[in-house]
Amino acid sequence: MTLEEAQKTVDEWIKTYGVRYFSELTNMAVLTEEVGELARIMARTYGDQSFKKGEKHDLGDEMADVLWVLICLANQTGVDLTLSLIHISEPTRRTPIS
């Protein structure tokens, strides 16, 4: 699935099942929450902490949650993620680490 297809898929899902998008500020808060959940799994999987009994720890699901909400924000604010990714990939935008 391309980023363009993902943006369309999320938009169709929101309009069909979600009724409408949450406000941009609410979605920013939700994105922060999802990143926190991802960070918890990373800390317990690769860091010094351990999982608590019964704690959810599907890394892929959490990454997908982060991407979903990021796509929601892009859709709401009119950002084409494909073009934005191409833009930041230009040599003048990113300096390779030597």
Residues covered by each model-derived region:
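Flexible "arm" and connector segments at domain edges
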Residues: 1-63, 67-89
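Single conserved hydrophobic/aromatic residue that forms the stacking wall/gate
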Residues: 86-98
